């Protein structure tokens, strides 16, 4: 029992060592474990179930929008990767290469896919002939490999799971609209399912995807004041279409190149959930994404009728929520701590006195509030409570983000803020790449996005003092 107690309690306080706090939660909440391959992880059932719920939401939305799922090869021939110059230069440092098949050296190196634009383009060039064949709306769920130098579970790994959408369209307007539609869906995923507020905006040319005309992003802020890119959607223009000779006959019978979009979210969203909502007691899961939304803990379960009533309660609640009954022989106090550490949104306690009074006790993970409810209406009350928890977690995350969002009008303010008050910094920018580079060199902060909701916090660029063009969110990032 002493060992069990230590397992539950031994989480490094986030204010003491945020990185270790994060690692402790990943391991102790049984989300993932390290593998023997540097930078790769084993996603355990608790972590994978969260990903499955993310998948379910995204996959349902994509199918509502008319997308179809496909599966592309994991290998890309080197000559294919070389076809789009900017693209290959952007990914070259991260590519893993296969040079041998068995004992035989391959005639051409094969890249282990870091992303699949080249494969989709090769396929689209074969199947598209007319505007009547458009749009093509494809998506795939897979893993990709990027040989990262610095890794951390979920946030930045050598191999990770994602969905990658690849669509081609007849017109620029249609493609741009589609790219923004997907970004909006990602925003809804984060806020409606993960209770995680995001800033929507456009990347600067320096930060956009390799080979893209425009990259749109959703940016979130973690507990420690660092930013995290939660999802991206790219308008690639006709760059890839021309490189891969994808052509179609337009409505006037002339040959044209389709306009391309690509977009993705990954398992790094699980890392974001940990760092936006977690506390020193462990993980805090938003109810709508939690694999188990409520756990029933029988109190004095050795007494007559307690386990039977708990089983009955589980059967009733299983019709409306994802519920678990823990009837193990561990002490209730240990169970409380364990499920708090694992982030289960709602705990339901029921013991002999509760049964006598036809009631149960609901305990919220987010703020530990207790509510007594009648067993006659427990299905409704539990569902209502889960919605309350979601809304409360979202509002708390918004409050934290807003409190850690600052304004800087010159470099002195910028440097002082980034060193002493980590968070988002809203500052004006002239549009010059040199200023963007200097800000990163001096402060370690990168441009996160030019938000769609622009405001003027100063007339001049925070770096050079010249006339400003855009408001930019800046920050140090994962």
Curated annotation (Swiss-Prot):
InterPro entries: aa-tRNA-synt_IIb, aa-tRNA-synth_II, aa-tRNA-synth_II/BPL/LPL, Anticodon-bd, Anticodon-bd_dom_sf, Pro-tRNA-ligase_IIa, Pro-tRNA-ligase_IIa_arc-type, Pro-tRNA_ligase_II_C. It comes from Clostridium botulinum (strain Langeland / NCTC 10281 / Type F). Keywords: Aminoacyl-tRNA synthetase, ATP-binding, Cytoplasm, Ligase, Nucleotide-binding, Protein biosynthesis. One of its GO terms (biological process) is prolyl-tRNA aminoacylation. Its main location: cytoplasm. The lineage of its organism: Bacteria, Bacillati, Bacillota, Clostridia, Eubacteriales. This is Proline--tRNA ligase. The keyword Aminoacyl-tRNA synthetase applies. NCBIfam families: proS_fam_I.
